[in-house]
Amino acid sequence: MTAGTAVDGARAVLLDTCALIWLANGDALQPQALSAIISAGSADGIFVSPASAWEIGMLSRPRQGRSGAVSFLPDPQSWFARFVAGPGIRIAPLLPEIMIAASFLPEPIHGDPGDRLILATARHHQMPVVTRDRKIIDYASAGHARVIAC
């Protein structure tokens, strides 16, 4: 899929947390996703959900049953702030209606609160989600969202 017309009428994409991390780390992305991100960036239309900040915080803390925390240097808050200060990147507004809509997404949807908020944000602003998350891709294939696989 191509980037959608969204916030302020510009072509825009919403990065899932995994896409945000891979983009920040310079990891390889699918050509279609990279093209959509570059196009959106030229119009200040690369959006990141505040839910991704929460997910990054959760990934960075040690938890039982997990091999180790993910390092975001120098710390998760600075890492996230540095990423969203990049050219073409904006924080997507997390409005009360988006938060409520995340509780009422069309089924079938899994229970991950971060993914639900990201999907509700994308639906509200009519943006595709750039992701490699199989659950989000499957949700989109059911017609409930648009994705660009990365």
Task: Please place each PLM-identified region on the residue numbering.
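Acidic, PIN/NYN-like endoribonuclease modules and their adjacent C-terminal/linker elements
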Residues: M1-D8, L119-C150
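Short, well-structured N-terminal submotif of metal-dependent ribonuclease cores
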Residues: M1-V48, Q64-P76, R134
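Alpha-helix capping/helix-boundary segments
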Residues: A19, S52-A53, I98, I118, ...
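Conserved beta-strand segments of alpha/beta enzyme cores
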Residues: G45, G88-R90, R146
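Phosphate/NTP-binding elements of NTP-utilizing enzymes
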Residues: I56
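Active-site-proximal, substrate-binding regions of enzyme catalytic domains
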Residues: S60-I89, E97
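Active-site neighborhoods of divalent-metal-dependent phosphate/nucleic-acid chemistry enzymes
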Residues: A85-R132
